[in-house]
Amino acid sequence: MYPRGVKRSHHDYHRQTAFRTIKRSTHRQTSKFISHFAKNFRGKLAPLKQLDESRLDALSLTELEQLKTIIEEKQQEKRAQNNAITFLPNLPTVPFADTNFSLKSLGLRPYNGDARDPKQRIRDRFPQTHERICLLTNDILETDLLLRYRQCLDSLTREENQQLMGDRIFSLTNSPCLAFTVATVEEACSYFKFHDLHNLPVNPQDLFMYTITVMKFEFFNKLNMAKLTCVFNDNGHGDIEYRKLRQLCGKPVLDREMPNSELEVQQQTPDSFRHPIQQAMSIVVTFARILRQIKEQIIQTKKPQFIRDFDTGRVAERYECGLMSRLIGKQFSNHKCDDVSCQNRIERIMAPWKPSLFFCTYFAKDAPKFKLFPNFPEEYRNLSFTCPKVDTEPSCSYSTNHDLPQTSHRSHKNHGTPKVKSKVCVEKPDTSILTTTKTTTEILIEESMETDNKIPNPRELNFNQAKQEEIVIININENVNSKHESESSVEMDLDLDYEADTCETNLNACSSDSE
């Protein structure tokens, strides 16, 4: 052993006491790692920078504008070069950017339908109102629509692609219902089918390809909200079939020993499973496994890879557009049981946009900041999630004794029964007149902010309590008089019917399928 910082000399082997001291320095860079530019031009960087600044000061405005256009062109060239580099490591060029294919070589025809241009759709992220997004199978597989989507996705920069994938993953993880998740999975599977049908090279960093694994887990999470042990119990052994689904998705099964391992279940073909939900999940798992193998092969070979070389079971070839929706709908529509909670769960996960917000505290001027205007279906577009701007006090079903007409007391005396009010008139706010003065809503906000800072007066509290006691509740009767029906088209019937089973709040209390 030698002292710290001392090493035996290799030049004088005959001398036992020949040592040399090693200078330990971790801050100084080794000479072999210094580039040629740093060796020769390290001391000349400052003069070059000053020289460039002096040249820029001598340029005129016209020359500066020309220089600006040249810089923008160079930036576009740099972006194109950076776009040619894949996100996968150790790949100098993109092996899947094959630009040699054309419509004639692929056997496609130009799309002339009502769907918008793919560039606009990718830019807007979501469809506009009354926009056509439901396409036929021939329009998806036999036209150049998906090919244009592929070309648009390949032309995105790395930052734009990451932003687009982040938005898609966020929408998947926050899906409102199973119907939206199934539609998203169907979209990715159709895109996968298009690449297999026309033998296109796969881009692993594609928007639809990259998020297949996320779709698999979110698809299972939405299905798991149903009582799958009851759904799979149509042919018996519901618990075992549910555990097979967990193995298929890669979820742990620890409470029971299964005959097959997780890897063996995932390598089975969709036809080997009994239930349609298992077959749909097997298709997604197979596509995710094929894409993972393609990624590994691209890193090793640095060559374009195709789905046909990895799809040994020909799952993509036998897949049809709309198959996922048919399998899920077939499973839930054919399920019949006496369990009320099971039926309620199926109805809730399949029916989107069920209203769950009954009043809102947002004011109309604050609504655009939060973007509270999503694209709802037509039957739910009449729902308002913001408070309208009303300058006058609207009519309501509650009124004080002073506001009631005097004839109402006579009617009680003559007929002996209270007057029935069957409808409520909804006054529409007049938004045609725009003034710079403060609205009633803004004045009320300022007054409420002023009163919050004051100490409450006991006399005012007693007066408000006495004023609230004067409120009279008008009874609402279901019988509607034909005379009042033709008074106004703006009137709205009050429907007080409700279902008894909607009072159920704890859905996962008695289920064994929740994680």
Curated annotation (Swiss-Prot):
UniProt-annotated stretches for the region Disordered: 398-422
Cellular localization per UniProt: Virion tegument; Virion; Host nucleus; Host cytoplasm
Domain of life where this protein originates: Viruses
Single GO biological process annotation from the record: regulation of DNA-templated transcription
Residues noted as binding Zn(2+) in the record, renumbered to the chain: 230, 335, 337, 342
Biased composition (Polar residues): 398-408
Biased composition (Basic residues): 409-422
Protein keywords: Host cytoplasm, Host nucleus, Metal-binding, Transcription, Transcription regulation, Virion, Virion tegument, Zinc, Zinc-finger
Zinc finger motifs (CHC2-type), residue ranges: 230-342
One term under GO cellular component: host cell cytoplasm
Pfam families listed in its UniProt record: Herpes_UL69
The keyword Zinc belongs to this UniProt entry's keyword annotation: yes
Annotated GO MF terms: zinc ion binding
Family: Belongs to the HHV-1 ICP27 protein family.
Job description of the protein: Immediate early (EI) protein that plays many roles during productive infection including regulation of viral gene expression and nuclear export of intronless viral RNAs.
Protein name: mRNA export factor ICP27 homolog
